[in-house]
Amino acid sequence: MTIFCELESGVDLPEYATEGASGADLRANIEEPIAVLPGQRVLVPTGIKMQIPQGYEVQVRPRSGLALKHGIMVVNSPGTIDADYRGEVCIILANFGESTFIIEPKMRVAQAVVAPVVQAKFIVVDQEEGLTTTSRGSRGFGHTGEK
């Protein structure tokens, strides 16, 4: 699959770190370091615009090392870049750690994962007719217990 990209000056294409990687690294397109205080959110530009093929999306996901070591997460994980979006890819990062985190210029801050998209047809059913029944029913949010 090919994704065409427009790049701002000095910006690198997303890169897969290993042959088997599913996520391509996205880098911070910033001129100066950004300090992210504990509990703070920031919008990090990448300097990349993408032309994603119809029927696909690009999901923006956290980097596991940043999450584990520093508590840095993509807030709307996974973030979705739709096939019809042509603006700059920006990443909403939050610091859930206990220390200030410094985002350096060109730092790898997130991953881009290409995924297929299926658009559903939503249909209203009459409440008398209702939805089909299942053994689970409407039980959710921890109904199966913790063990």
Curated annotation (Swiss-Prot):
Q: Give the species this sequence originates from.
A: Chlamydia felis (strain Fe/C-56) (Chlamydophila felis)
Any single GO molecular-function term of the entry would be: dUTP diphosphatase activity
Q: Which domain of life is it from?
A: Bacteria
Pathway assigned in UniProt: Pyrimidine metabolism; dUMP biosynthesis; dUMP from dCTP (dUTP route): step 2/2
Task: Name it.
Answer: Deoxyuridine 5'-triphosphate nucleotidohydrolase
* Family designation: Belongs to the dUTPase family.
Cofactors demanded by this protein: Mg(2+)
* Record Pfam families: dUTPase (PF00692)
Q: Which SUPFAM superfamilies match?
A: dUTPase-like
Read off the InterPro entries from this record: dUTPase, dUTPase-like, dUTPase-like_sf, dUTPase_trimeric
**E.C. no:** 3.6.1.23
Q: Which Gene3D superfamilies match?
A: 2.70.40.10
Q: Which residues bind substrate?
A: R63, S64, G65, N76, T80, I81, D82
Q: Which GO terms describe its biological process?
A: dUMP biosynthetic process; dUTP catabolic process
Instruction: Spell out the reaction equation it catalyses.
Output: dUTP + H2O = dUMP + diphosphate + H(+)
- What keyword terms does UniProt attach to this protein? Hydrolase, Magnesium, Metal-binding, Nucleotide metabolism
Q: Gene that codes for this? A: dut
Q: NCBIfam families under this entry?
A: dut, PRK00601.1
What role does it play?
This enzyme is involved in nucleotide metabolism: it produces dUMP, the immediate precursor of thymidine nucleotides and it decreases the intracellular concentration of dUTP so that uracil cannot be incorporated into DNA.
Where does the secretion signal sit in this chain? none
